[in-house]
Amino acid sequence: KESSAASDVYKRQLTDSVIEMVEESGFPGMKVLQFAFDENEDSPYLTHRYERNCIVYTGTHDNETTRGWFRNLSQHDRNFARAYIGCEGKHETAAVWSMIRAAMSSVADRCVIPVQDYLCLGNEARINEPSTLGDNWKWRMKKGQLNETIIQKIYKMTKLYGRLVKEETEEKEKTEADREKISDK
């Protein structure tokens, strides 16, 4: 099935020695949530198997969008994914937002959500299909697609799961102000 092409290539490259090297290096591992839902219901990509030192993605530039991926799942895998991510809505957009919630609520130190997933777009917005020529790297977000409703939804979920990042400039300004107070004394 097409939706598993990128995951099959990626998974084949993850030999025991590669996994061991990543663990020894201290670099964060990469967890692609779409890879969790295949015939293996004991997948290391399921969020309850994550360690903190990893980066979770709903999908990457080489994957289908989450909506496109969900549409192409087998009925068995779709049912398992819905049950695992707690998706009660029947519409594909409910599944996309449930995947985003699953990624954000995981223990992973970092979480990356492609904008196409926030916009609940299908595979017409896919970035790259590996080993193919043609329309790769051509998708562009249109002005106004990321509207205030979506921005607020992203903000609320990001805040809920403790993933808001303080601006470095705010921290830097506070530190500089504190130094000035000390030097004035």
Write out the residue ranges for each language-model feature.
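Structured C-terminal cap/extension of enzyme domains
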Residues: 120-170, 176-185
